[in-house]
Amino acid sequence: MSFLFSGELRSPKNASTERFVSVRGSDAYKELCSLGMLPSSKDLRQDSIFRAVANEVKQVKQDVVEINSRVVAEVQVEKELAEHLNQKLKASEYKVDHLAKKLVRLRQKHSTNTQRQVRKLDDCIGDFESNIRELHGTVAEMVDRLGSVDMGLPEKERLIGDHQLNARHYPLLYELFRDKFPSKFGAPRGLGIASSLPERAFPKALGESDTGDLSHHDVATREAPPLEMDSAEEGCFYHPQNLAVDHIRNHFMNSRSSDINERELEISGSAHATKASSARENIPERILMPQFQKVASPQTAPTLENIEVTVPFSSKSAGHERHSG
């Protein structure tokens, strides 16, 4: 054992004397002595080991329990949130499905109703067309009959012609008979009948008073001036198939005539209040004129003695109300 000796080995020849070094004096022994004492066998048992690390084991158990509780709580929260979202999704799915079914039912219902209404509308349009054709046939038959009846009358008593039937008083009949019997009518004319009437039958201008014969002004200014129209406008308004435009034109002519008469009455009433309250009012020729009624000429216009004026066209009552006010 080399660690029991110090010094170098010498050959036997050279080693005459040996020096003994003790174990306690060696460095290895010193290192061995510096080590701790070995525990006893009792201390190396399992229960002894767990008793030695009991605090550490307890802390580890507590940490594991805390981690487990936190993980379980988080999992429970996530589970509740997932269930809540699932319930909302189911409710939304039910609503969407309900709305979709309702929309499909409404679409089918409205589609059925629309198809039924379209069929009814087609039937109504067909009925209208058949009625229009029947009306055209009836009108043509009536015109033929009237023409045959008129041909049976003496020459002087016949009504179909420019001398009896004119475009101003009978626009629709004039157009019908002129198209059916063009030989009995002259060339198409505009409504220029007013040009043949005396100038005194129409007022000079709205708001302009006459300083001459006041009685002549009272009679003349109460006549409604007719609307002058050329042949193009006349054809537009008085075409037999254009009844709506004819109604608008009649309404416009009536409103214009009533406005002119009211302004004329205000002018004449301011100059002669006493005379205007007792004077008889002449009826404008366009106010009470029906569509197929012949109206007398302005020289023989009817008065309040032989005709009854309705309330919407009673200019006399309006004049009395203004004077009494």
From Swiss-Prot:
The keyword Ribosomal protein does not apply. Its main location: cytoplasm. The keyword Nucleotidyltransferase does not apply. It is found in: Cytoplasmic vesicle; Vacuole; Cytoplasm. GO terms for cellular component: cytoplasmic vesicle; vacuole. Keywords: Coiled coil, Cytoplasm, Cytoplasmic vesicle, Transport, Vacuole. It comes from the Eukaryota. Residues 70-135 form a coiled coil. Component of the biogenesis of lysosome-related organelles complex-1 (BLOC-1) composed of at least BLI1, BLS1, CNL1, KXD1, SNN1 and VAB2. Belongs to the VAB2 family. Component of the biogenesis of lysosome-related organelles complex-1 (BLOC-1) involved in endosomal cargo sorting. This is Biogenesis of lysosome-related organelles complex 1 subunit VAB2. It comes from Eremothecium gossypii (strain ATCC 10895 / CBS 109.51 / FGSC 9923 / NRRL Y-1056) (Yeast).
